[in-house]
Amino acid sequence: MKFGLFFLNFQKDGITSEETLDNMVKTVTLIDSTKYHFNTAFVNEHHFSKNGIVGAPITAAGFLLGLTNKLHIGSLNQVITTHHPVRVAEEASLLDQMSEGRFILGFSDCESDFEMEFFRRHISSRQQQFEACYEIINDALTTGYCHPQNDFYDFPKVSINPHCYSENGPKQYVSATSKEVVMWAAKKALPLTFKWEDNLETKERYAILYNKTAQQYGIDISDVDHQLTVIANLNADRSTAQEEVREYLKDYITETYPQMDRDEKINCIIEENAVGSHDDYYESTKLAVEKTGSKNILLSFESMSDIKDVKDIIDMLNQKIEMNLP
């Protein structure tokens, strides 16, 4: 099992955007030390509200790569459908080259109908556009060139410069956003990123569908290393941790899931993520790992209000990781 962090970068009330991003920078540079046994850090993409103030996660990842030496850093969910695929490929290839293989491309389809319309994409062909964009990006990263001729893109063969440092391009993960994406990923043996806000039943259903699809199409997934995102807030006082998470998530849940009961959704997240006292985090996370088959755990401590408490929890978890190293 490997461990890393992910950053949603929600801008909390009373906190500036500078402070929000600075907290991410401080945490990433902290765990880049050889003292820590965290391997990765990922930046979330979100648009048009304070419920995630990074609209360009590859750019943010590039900044963090320049500050670090050890960590592999990437986008958690670069939305490839609403960006030009050649541009995504150029940025990913450049970071792979400049970081000497430390960049990771985590990508996603577009879940927001508003963003699809805003960026002038057709909602009715969402999955087809996603797949077309990926093929262009993957061709560019694995061969250095792309020459698409499909319903959405048709242009002459172009070279993507600089070509990647890594032999087959940067490591890739795709967000498990729908059954269509999960089945598509299984056919390509692409590892999934399971979303922290999905309930365990949904995550398990996606994992089963992934395995079933791979088996049906004869795809070897023995080396696939899914990753599980987990909201973490630990406190000696369980209620303090829970209230901090409720406060942190309330606006995002209202924005993203307007059709759901907000409190019910947040309570489910609290129950199934690592939220509560120091004894509360293990069983729920262990169960999610078992149900999804994940080999990587990504943690977000951003709901914790005291940065010193964050360091203390990171140190505590780091000791536990160290005790279990082979």
UniProtKB/Swiss-Prot annotation:
It catalyses: a long-chain fatty aldehyde + FMNH2 + O2 = a long-chain fatty acid + hnu + FMN + H2O + 2 H(+). Its EC number is 1.14.14.3. GO terms for molecular function: alkanal monooxygenase (FMN-linked) activity. It is an enzyme of class 1 (oxidoreductase). The keyword Protein biosynthesis does not apply. GO terms for cellular component: cytosol. GO terms for biological process: bioluminescence. It comes from the Bacteria. Keywords: Flavoprotein, FMN, Luminescence, Monooxygenase, Oxidoreductase, Photoprotein. Pfam families: Bac_luciferase. CDD domains: Alkanal_monooxygenase. Belongs to the bacterial luciferase oxidoreductase family. Heterodimer of an alpha and a beta chain. Light-emitting reaction in luminous bacteria. The specific role of the beta subunit is unknown, but it is absolutely required for bioluminescence activity. This is Alkanal monooxygenase beta chain.
